[in-house]
């Protein structure tokens, strides 16, 4: 999937000037317009392939479906709550964020919240401003020796851990993705959640808001916590059940909470914000000059690198696409799409299970990025959808009646020659199997149903191929075929045959354009099909 035709980018929220400068230096046109209504945003996007936002702009399904040229949405920040990911994915629009841009700012705010909870600094400040001097009321607690539970050990979680360890806190945590030995390297002992709750004096959450993390702290988990636990949420509103938190504060099970985020922002229900044991901020996690500059810089660099074909970073809705920018993987992506298009033409818009098999050590982990490319080849012509691409391929797979499986064989079979790696695409339970390989950077067709081409057949994007199977002993067959091409005013560009398999030979003709019909060919051959990708 190429983004070389991305020319113009709209920046619809306030960003550091460096964002615009980097985009322009990378050869992109930039339009900056803020505070746009939905209708104004749609109007501006009619001439833009890219959109960069912070959190103010709402990229809804209406906006996405109306923006005919839009290819990429970049979120200068971590959360993508303001982008309709499902609508973007279905439309084949790539969504990117800058997961590291505001990590330090969010981590520092979290640490500040922990300190404020321990010493009741905001409450004491408010008391002083009221003209009071209440030393006894604001008795605090030391952090030294206390246990901090960190739920989510990504970049922010680990930055919080290393900083709070400087205060003498013992850090424990949980993350289903980070390996225990990795978290141990930055001083966090991983434990199951049920073991974490009763050990913690402080708990801070740093996970995305997912179905599995919504209400992670709830009535049941608060009941398992140490009495007097203090809770910090600078991640996403909803990870801490706000009703359960209020009940825990009222009962004394929770001694205090620091909240930078809420389920509804700004919160209409003020019960938590107004509670004397709650410290709150209006979602300030990324609100530092440094974070804003860093996020603007990072998203601009990501756009330029993507357009130049250098790399793809921060992908939210098509992680497998990241591998497509690897110099090793790029030609295999092209091969996978070509074999998918070949299979679609050969098997006649197949349904059922498509088997994608990688062979050879260097393709060991490539199945997840090659299978979407196979789907693109299968669906683009059959569905007549120009927007079928690596972003939405997996989403459209099931709707098309397909089930694509991937598997890997470490070594390529000896009978397939000296090549180290092969890609096989087959229709399960039917006689359709195509094998390809890459020579240098060129995708090549190696075999059809075991009939090997020597040399292999080049698969060039945009070049139509006519393939047919026939008896090898008919001397009049080739002149007849050339005559049929001439009648259709189609030029023969090249011609290759396979070795004999099951008494027949596969023939491949590169032609100047697709034939209007294959009916005249059917009386001369066993089967025939044509395709391009």
Curated annotation (Swiss-Prot):
Enzyme Commission number(s): 1.1.1.95, 1.1.1.399, 1.1.1.37
Signal peptide range in chain numbering: none
Entry-annotated residues carrying Phosphoserine: 14
Keyword Oxidoreductase listed: yes
Keywords assigned by UniProt, alphabetized: Acetylation, Amino-acid biosynthesis, NAD, Oxidoreductase, Phosphoprotein, Serine biosynthesis
Molecular-function GO terms, alphabetical: L-malate dehydrogenase (NAD+) activity; NAD binding; phosphoglycerate dehydrogenase activity
UniProt-recorded name of the protein: D-3-phosphoglycerate dehydrogenase
Pathway as given in its UniProt record: Amino-acid biosynthesis; L-serine biosynthesis; L-serine from 3-phospho-D-glycerate: step 1/3
Biological process annotations from GO: L-serine biosynthetic process
Tree of life domain: Eukaryota
